[in-house]
Amino acid sequence: MRFSVVTVIILGMLLRFPAAASDILTQKVDQIFSVYDKPGSPGCSLGVIRDGNFVYRKAYGLATLELGVPLSPQSVFYMGSVSKQFTAASLVLAAEQGYLSLDDDVRKYIPELPDYGHVVTLREMIHQTSGFRDFYTLLGLSGHDPADFNSPEETFKIVVRQRGLNNIPGDEWIYSNTNYFLLGIVVKRATKKSLAEFAAENIFTPLGMSHTLFYDDHTVVVASRVAAYDSGPHDSFHVDWSTTFELVGAGGLMSTVDDLLLWDGNFYANRLGKGTLVQELQTPGVLNNGNKISYAMGLDLGNYRGLPIVEHGGALFGYRTELLRFPEQKFSVICLCNIASAVPENLARKVADIYLSDKLQPGASALNPPSNESFPDPATFAGKYLDRRTHLMYSFTASNGNLMAWGAVLIRINANQFYDLGSDVITFEPSKGVIHAKLDLKGETYFSGSRVEELHLGEPVLASYTGQFQSTELGTVYSLSVEKGTLTLRNGGNPPQDLTPIAKDEFDAGDLGRLVFERDSGGRVLGFRVFTQDARGVGFKKED
């Protein structure tokens, strides 16, 4: 067969077009990560998956600054809370094998836990509706640096000392690392194998994930292990990781971009267990009132620019990780970083924006909000808002025409609604001169509070709150005194914390949460309870 010169040229151009289009996409991706692609910088390892194969995989930055070793798709990262989906999978597989039932009372396996007056099931723990207080928060309240607390035994002790729950099991969704820490123990006690052993035999080895493990022994050498860092002054970095951390269940997984390709593929062609694993992992939890939540089994179910997504991120020390899946498009992004300032949830979405541009709906962004001159100035909503039921408090600030919370710009939806990239929708409702704020999370109202103003109390009133207060649940003592007209809290050698009055007998303690004082019938202070986002009602009693 003969081809004319023109035909040959046209065929050549057609053959080159796909490659050229691919080059354009990858150049756009490289631009997203260019901040890390420079000498002497930590960075990220990236995998972009379509139809079960990588369409792009690349690493930016160094795995260890000390040795100058570059990151690669084979670099082994600490995965943080991405671990939870693997712990959940271990529970499902253990149930299939007859070792346990997901509807069992957790005290069947961990009788050291107290009787809370309500049964807590393994299923409620998997879906984060159990009510268990978060152990990282408890460790912080007790005066420890939770990120550097490495002992499973000591962590277990503080968990079983708790005499209360955040909520009636099944009533609310409250994210708590305690759930998955305890589930790791359940696997060990039910199967007689550690979580590391069970997951290796039932997940990692069958899928060929040869560089993935639950790191429960800090003496084990892990080849190609990545160090982690945080940013310092003048473009410097400092070490932000631990060589002795060995808590597993809530975290503890180590893996690579290449191995996670195999895990991602299993969601489309399951090779584990009896065939129902993938369906169970992606089934949303159900509250006692019958409402479904958008948290499944260690996986967040959501929507991004009109497309369903399944995802989970992780963060501990300087490690930041994200697995983002678009199941209908069979498209996923794996983004693993070793610098604390990275936000892989955002980075993964930006990559998806490039590859799925023809399928994603247009959406407002922080840089391109809906324009309407009649919208109230965002500064109208700035301030502190207190939920009187849960004693949660959120602060919103205005900056450069934007409303901000949690250190990020909120994206405007309409006149009174905003959201962040975690899909939390915040609604502000002015009523009778008072502004109310409502935050919807996982399909439920998570926060409902009114804006509060700082109270001004004189020293004689503040003096009534002073003294030594002991918590048997935390094994610690808080000392409260009036210093320069301010009620101040001290706990061991930690920096003092000023307390700000925000309501009757209630003080804001910054990162320590809110202190709500309790009095007897004569008005004498008996003690207080501490309320944080994931540890509510921790008790302190005033010492005589």
Where are these regions (language model features)?
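Short, well-ordered beta-strand elements
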Residues: 311, 322-339, 435-439, 526-530
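Structured C-terminal helix/loop/strand segments within mature extracytoplasmic catalytic/sensor domains
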Residues: 317-361
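Short, conserved catalytic-motif segment at the N-terminal edge
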Residues: 22-79, 99-104, 157-164, 237
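Short, surface-exposed loop or secondary-structure junction motifs
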Residues: 64, 117-327
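Peripheral terminal and inter-domain segments
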Residues: 19-21, 349-544
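Active-site SXXK
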Residues: 33, 46, 52, 76-103, ...
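Bacterial N-terminal signal peptides
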Residues: 6-16
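Short, small/polar residue-rich loop motifs at catalytic or cofactor-binding pockets
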Residues: 40-43, 317-320, 390, 474, ...
